[in-house]
């Protein structure tokens, strides 16, 4: 199984903010979430232009959602989520901030709060699928696993992957109380 097929979460949670915050002005920006249905549209988000993976190559059973600014629909991050019926949870397949928000790879960022929003979107989908917010995924490394345990009170599972984590229903509800966005059903 390739890394794209398996999925992996390599995103830092920088600041817990209800909406996105501009790092220069401190302005708070409202956000919207929309599902990306077209694999052709996903070709815009490639590893070669800073999106960590080629998003059009993820498995077809993974739903992709975009977090965008409400005022101009500029995409700030993407999250891939799969309905994992066997685990009774949403599987957080991939999550990636836009290159202009990734200070770990590009040295600076336009907005803080993107990473937490992407986790909240996965929790939202879990509720939609009847799992009360439960989500699990594979952290990219031990440092990120510890980060998710510290920030989200995730639990270490390590059954399917050495850095597998689980966010239970209670912690997912806490996420959804903090992060605010609107759904854009286009």
What would you call each of these model-derived segments?
Residues 1-109, 117, 124-136, 143, ...:
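Non-catalytic substrate-recognition and accessory regions of acyl/acetyltransferase enzymes
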């Amino acid at each position: 199984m390739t890394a794209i097929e398996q999925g992996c979460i390599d995103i830092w949670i920088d600041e817990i903010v209800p909406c996105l915050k501009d790092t220069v002005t401190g302005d708070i920006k409202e956000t919207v979430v929309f599902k990306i249905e077209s694999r052709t549209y996903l070709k815009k988000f490639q590893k070669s232009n800073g999106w960590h993976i080629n998003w059009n190559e993820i498995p077809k059973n993974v739903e992709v959602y975009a977090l965008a600014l409400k005022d101009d629909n500029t995409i700030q991050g993407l999250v891939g989520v799969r309905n994992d019926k066997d685990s009774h949870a949403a599987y957080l397949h991939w999550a990636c901030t836009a290159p202009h928000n990734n200070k770990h790879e590009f040295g600076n960022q336009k907005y803080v709060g993107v990473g937490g929003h992407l986790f909240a979107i996965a929790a939202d989908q879990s509720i939609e699928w009847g799992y009360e917010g439960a989500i699990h995924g594979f952290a990219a490394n031990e440092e990120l696993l510890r980060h998710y345990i510290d920030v989200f009170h995730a639990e270490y599972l390590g059954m399917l992957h050495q850095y597998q984590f689980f966010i239970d229903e209670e912690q997912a509800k806490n996420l959804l109380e903090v992060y605010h966005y609107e759904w854009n059903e286009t």
